[in-house]
Every structure is written in C-alpha cells, then in structure tokens.
From Swiss-Prot:
This is Serine hydroxymethyltransferase. The lineage of its organism: Bacteria, Pseudomonadati, Chlorobiota, Chlorobiia, Chlorobiales. SUPFAM superfamilies: PLP-dependent transferases (SSF53383). NCBIfam families: PRK00011.1. Its cofactor is pyridoxal 5'-phosphate. It catalyses: (6R)-5,10-methylene-5,6,7,8-tetrahydrofolate + glycine + H2O = (6S)-5,6,7,8-tetrahydrofolate + L-serine. Pathway: One-carbon metabolism; tetrahydrofolate interconversion; Amino-acid biosynthesis; glycine biosynthesis; glycine from L-serine: step 1/1.
Length: 440
C-alpha cells in the first residue's frame, strides 16, 4: 500500500499505521467481529469520494454534483438487494448501531416495550442494554439461553413475549454460536402483535452464502454491519424483504388528499435527516465493491471454509477439555467458558496478546465476573480464513491457545508465550496478506 506521501508529511500517523500493519500481518486475528477487506475495497474507501457531500438519496440530493456518487450508491443498493434477496435496502448507516437506532426510532415511541437477547448471554448493546439508548429510551426486556444447553430457549421467549407484549422483538447476537430460528420468532411476534427485527451483523456473510437460515421471509426488518463475515468496510445497512405500510400510520399529502407512507419512506427519512446528515460516500463505494465480491462464487467457498475452520477449532477445544457455550458452533465463532481452566477472560486475552494471538474477553451466560474481567473469551475464524488457513491450521491454533491458557498460572508462562508467538508469526507469514505492506 503506497504510503510515501503520508510518511513524508506526518511521521507520527505513518508510524501508527505501520505498527498496525505489522500487527495485522504478523499476528493472528481471531476477534470474531474483525476481518480483512480486499485491496479493491480499501482503494474505494481511500478514494476522493471522501470529499463529496451527498445529503439525501440518489436522484434526490440536497447538493449538486452528485451524479457519480449516485452511481456508487445505486450499485451498492442493487448489489445488496441481489445478495440478500430483499426489496428494500438503505446503505447509508455509518454503523450497525446506527442501523439499529434507525429501525427502533422509525417504529417505536419512547417507553415502548422491546425484547432482545441479554447482553451477558450473547446479545448486543443495541438490543436493550440499560447502558445503551435502546435500554434507556425504551422499556427493554431480555430473553436468554438455557443454563444447561447454552441455547436460546424458544419456550421462554414465547412466555416472555406473552407476558410483556413488546412492540418489537429483536433476534440477533454478538456472541452466540448457534443459528436463529427466524420462523419461530415470527410466529411468536405475530401472537403478540410485535414487529420482528433480525440483527445479522455477525453471520451476514454466511447468510448471504446460503449457509444459515434466511431472515428475509420472516422478519420485518433486517440490519447488519458490512464488515465482519461480509468482508466489506466498516459500516451498517438496513434491509426489508418486502415493503409495507408503516405501522404508526404516518401519512403524506398527495394531490387528492393523503396516503399512509410506506415503511421504506419512513425508514429513509429516519436515517437521513432523522439520525444522520451526509453519508460517507467513500465507504458506500467500498460497500458496493464488497457486495460485488460477495456475489462471486469464490465468496461462497470462503464462507464454507469459515464454518469448517470454526467447527474444526471448536472440536479441538472440546478435545482439550474446554467448555464451549452451547456445545459447539454453527457459524464463524465460539465462546469459551474458562472457569474450569482457573483463568479469567481478561488474563487469557492479555496472555494470548503476548503470544501473538488477538481475541477478546467476553462474558459467558450466568457469569459471576464483571464485563471488565469476564469468565470467557470469544474466538472467530473469519479473518484467519481470509488469509487462506484451513482446518489443520485451525487445529494447530487451538493447540497453541491451549499451551498459553494451560500455563497461565505457571512460572514459565512468559517463555511459553514467546515460543507460541514465534510459531504464530511463522504461521502468519506462510499465509500472507497480499498488498497490506507499507513502504519503509
């Protein structure tokens, strides 16, 4: 990657980027929410489209000179529709949280009841956490996983829905290794007159590849990030399988009177000007490139390998005596409960960092430790698969992680971390990230 101008103009920023480049290329990225974009995506994101203001939507902008950014946004929208089989898409949200906020604000009033997966059971901040807008502006109620199986108890979901009668049910997670039964969630939502939103930020790439159940036929709204398993730039997106009249009865004047606005109209207005102003057109261009890549046959091969790698790694961990929440994985991630290993998530994360392996500490269901300590770690295979690693490498990595965690309380842990770091560097150099270097 050409960074000569940056190196000459701003050495401090250049050195920060150079250090991050070295970290990404020579250490192993296993954070489940991270991935590596293609050079084409990075070129689009680094293009001069970053200079253009484009408030509004293609063909209806508040600024002139938008003919070319209109092309980029229309490409992103059309490709996303084809990729996910949806009728409506908005590619302007800056993040997954922004996308979720737009949906909630478009169909709810402050104080309305919502239901989502408990954050400590694998949910997300925007699904009703009390420290987030979703839990502060709305009356949030959480469902969780079964203590024995680690899987979502749909009977309990139904019981809670019948009890609290939410206006919106959210199905989605940030640390749940099983799939979601969107059909069952829709049946529950219909029983209580609730709308249903699927947050597929984590498994979006696997869903696009047809490897996990499709939320479009069952959910009123589907939100996602565009990075993670989609391998695009950091951003968000809102989709609907089909359009419908908005449930709040918001109307618009017509030549002959008025009509009820379609949900797509309400949603577009909620994104802009509701919660955002100008879209990030360079990022939207990057989204278009990423969606184009995801439409190619090679992307499905990638997604298949992501699942194979996760399954192989989970099987290896189970064989080494680790407790995997929910008993295994059907997607790209797994959550390890380390309580039987006598080490907490914070210690494990720090030691693995010293060993050249990046994971994140994570609460496990019914955790008795704080979110800053936790009893578990979350591991994902999306990024390592982008490098070209396969099942054997996944098993090797599980063994190296075990070496570090098993020695956490021993006097020789520092030496083991140094040895593992060397092995990890050799593994990463065997699967280089093409085009990610910086000019010295």
């Amino acid at each position: 990657m050409d960074t000569d101008i940056l190196r000459m103009q701003d050495k401090e920023v250049f050195e920060a980027i150079a250090g991050e480049t070295l970290r990404q290329t020579e250490t192993l990225e296993l954070i489940a929410s991270e991935n590596f974009t293609s050079r084409a995506v990075m070129q689009a994101c680094g293009s001069l489209m970053t200079n253009k203001y484009a408030e509004g939507y293609p063909g209806k902008r508040y600024y002139g000179g938008c003919e070319f950014v209109d092309i980029a946004e229309n490409l992103a929208r059309d490709r996303a529709k084809k990729l996910f089989g949806c009728q409506y898409v908005n590619v302007q949200p800056h993040s997954g949280s922004s996308a979720n906020m737009a949906v909630l604000f478009s169909v709810l009033k402050p104080g309305d009841r919502i239901m989502g997966l408990d954050l400590s059971h694998g949910g997300h901040l925007t699904h009703g956490s009390p420290v987030n807008f979703s839990g502060q502006l709305f009356d949030a109620h959480s469902y969780g996983v079964d203590r024995e199986t680690g899987c979502i108890d749909m009977n309990r979901v139904e019981e809670l829905a019948l009890e609290v009668r939410p206006k919106l049910i959210i199905c989605g997670a940030s640390a749940y290794s099983q799939g979601f039964d969107f059909k069952a969630f829709r049946e529950i939502a219909d029983k209580v007159g609730a709308l249903l939103m699927a947050d597929i930020a984590h498994p979006a790439g696997l869903i696009a590849a047809g490897l996990l159940s499709d939320p479009m036929p069952h959910c009123h709204f589907v939100t996602t990030t565009t990075h993670k398993t989609l391998r695009g730039p950091r951003g968000g997106m809102i989709m609907m399988g089909s359009d419908f009249e908005n449930p709040l009865g918001i109307t618009i004047k017509t030549k002959t009177g008025s009509r009820v606005k379609m949900m797509s109209e309400v949603m577009d207005a909620e994104v802009m000007p509701g919660i955002q102003g100008g879209p990030l057109m360079h990022i939207i261009a990057g989204k278009a490139v990423a969606f184009g890549e995801a439409l190619q046959p090679a992307f499905r091969e990638y997604a298949v390998q992501v699942r194979k790698n996760a399954a192989a790694m989970a099987e290896s961990f189970a064989g080494l005596g680790y407790n995997i929440v929910s008993g295994g994985t059907k997607n790209h991630l797994m959550l390890l409960d380390l309580r039987n290993k006598e080490v907490n998530g914070k210690v494990a994360e720090n030691l693995l960092h010293e060993a050249g392996i990046t994971v994140n500490k994570n609460m496990v269901p019914f955790d008795d430790k704080s979110p800053f300590v936790t009893s578990g770690i979350r591991i994902g295979t999306a990024a390592m698969t982008t490098r070209g690693m396969t099942e054997n490498d996944s098993r090797t990595v599980a063994g190296l992680i075990d070496q570090v965690i098993s020695s956490a309380n021993s006097a020789g842990v520092e030496e083991i971390c140094r040895t593992v770091r060397h092995d990890i560097r050799e593994l990463c150099l065997a699967y280089p990230l093409e085009g990610y270097g910086v000019n010295p």
